[in-house]
């Protein structure tokens, strides 16, 4: 129910003191309202109950196990929130001069240093405000590199069939023609097809390693050799960096540029449309094209590096320095863990994924890549169960809600039919994983005995199974009641 539908005429909350110097005459006439705003009329208690009730209906990492594949829904430590909200950071104006921002700039400089070491790259820019924007920046840098060499005919970007949807989108936005490369039955890039595909038009290839199939690209060195010998560059999508922290670096694999998803690997908040951060790191070929500003260090201290110091930069992607609050949270997360802690992140995220994968296989679920070890996530395909019982991946996802678990990613990657992409992350305990396994075992029994129970799930949520066709064709998304209902609050 919308809050407007609870409104009753003349119902009020507590009165608030009027500002001492408030005078409507001080406000320009064109900015004054001529009609009263359409606001609901409720008591303070009703408002508190309404929004508290809504908050309890959310699934989140703070309330439920959230094994959303390719999203790395790990716990965000509250210490990072507290420290990033210290007055010296929180109240700093974005245009404050560098001499008055030395502590802030030091944090960003040290974050740059740590991230370049983690990735094996030469330099990094922190200004991109989301992973997708960082990805766009990296592809734009590849384009700038080729154009600086007069290679205007390099117009093709190779993208695997298991790639994130943002990969071909970023390539297309930068003017490249996208060429799809297939993967083998074991999840590796098809090297023979890659050799046939590269040529004088090849600008580069975009890869995630481990891939979205949940397996490590075992022939990455050969892939890098093929692309570089053809005159192209390698772009690394940092979506799955969590699996290899402290173990293997993208720069050491041969990648030339990459972006990092701070909301995944480095425990900054997910969702809500932002704020986000997607730093871009580059090797020797591309570092001069990084977006500005960056933070530099000189004998006086720390300062901004802008277009003046970086004339080959692709330019600015954000106002000021990007989303500083998110960057500070990632910095604090890294300082809390240290090198050994980061290495344990990779170990436990991989351990949890493989434990969960093997247990589900033992129950009777079909693995998409049974001969491969999982990295940080894995895929089960429900195609045999769909054929036998008519139950789909969507049905299982809905039923998991009744057992108190957020559903894994479903129907992605697209090349695996009826799939669940499951990523438990390193912050989950064995007890939590065992509870999830128990739920999946019960669901498997339900599939074989009472499949209709799944087809109509969920049964214990505020909103049950929607008519998705009707919802898509007759979208009803609004913040206030319509027609007759509106009379409740505009009388």
From Swiss-Prot:
One of its GO terms (cellular component) is glycine cleavage complex. The keyword Zinc does not apply. It catalyses: N(6)-[(R)-lipoyl]-L-lysyl-[glycine-cleavage complex H protein] + glycine + H(+) = N(6)-[(R)-S(8)-aminomethyldihydrolipoyl]-L-lysyl-[glycine-cleavage complex H protein] + CO2. Coiled coil: none annotated. Pfam families: GcvP2_C, GDC-P. This is Probable glycine dehydrogenase (decarboxylating) subunit 2. It comes from Coxiella burnetii (strain CbuK_Q154). The gene is gcvPB. NCBIfam families: PRK04366.1. Keywords: Oxidoreductase, Pyridoxal phosphate. Its EC number is 1.4.4.2. GO terms for molecular function: glycine binding; glycine dehydrogenase (decarboxylating) activity; pyridoxal phosphate binding. GO terms for biological process: glycine decarboxylation via glycine cleavage system. It comes from the Bacteria. Its cofactor is pyridoxal 5'-phosphate. The glycine cleavage system is composed of four proteins: P, T, L and H. In this organism, the P 'protein' is a heterodimer of two subunits.
